[in-house]
Design a protein with these regions (language model features):
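Conserved GNAT acetyl-CoA-binding A-motif
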Residues: 93, 99-113
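Short acidic/glycine-enriched loop/turn segments that link adjacent beta-strands
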Residues: 43-45, 70, 134-138
Length: 147
């Protein structure tokens, strides 16, 4: 039987630590990047969501921040390798998009790893231009207009 999965923000200090560790584990460890928390100047002003199982395992995550009054940006999206293609990424994107609408955004941008382009296209995002990431992995800037 599969665990029940809840999409929500981390609540406790312990959950925030697990969330930070998960982001590194999924997004940076495979690139052999040292375990440094993935935090920037927008971290505290951002909206963080995770998919967490009833056994308290984080299996997906994503973050949203506002670039300006009308444009939001998704960053740090990731899904556990053994949980991919189960709809968890879509659930996180839906929650992030709903948050962007609440904040008054008219569009969302993101910089997708090229291996994830088809996923984001399936969510309604359009490729805009190549993006140079600090990870040296090919990325593409994408955008979606909210309705």
């Amino acid at each position: 039987m599969m665990d029940q999965i809840e999409i929500r923000s981390p609540k406790t200090e312990a959950e925030w630590k697990k969330y930070d560790d998960f982001r590194w584990e999924i997004l940076r460890k495979p690139l052999n990047i040292p375990h440094i928390p993935l935090k920037d100047d927008l971290e505290d002003k951002s909206y963080h969501f995770m998919a967490i199982t009833s056994s308290n395992e984080i299996v997906a995550c994503g973050r949203l921040h506002m670039n300006n009054d009308k444009e939001a940006q998704i960053r740090y999206m990731g899904v556990s390798e053994n949980r991919r293609r189960m709809g968890l990424g879509s659930l996180i994107v839906d929650r992030l998009e709903n948050q962007a609408k609440v904040l008054g955004a008219s569009n969302i941008t993101l910089n997708a790893r090229n291996v994830a382009l088809n996923f984001y296209k399936s969510q309604g995002y359009e490729a805009i231009e190549p993006y140079q990431s600090d990870t040296n992995i090919p990325h593409t800037r994408m955008e979606k207009f909210l309705t």
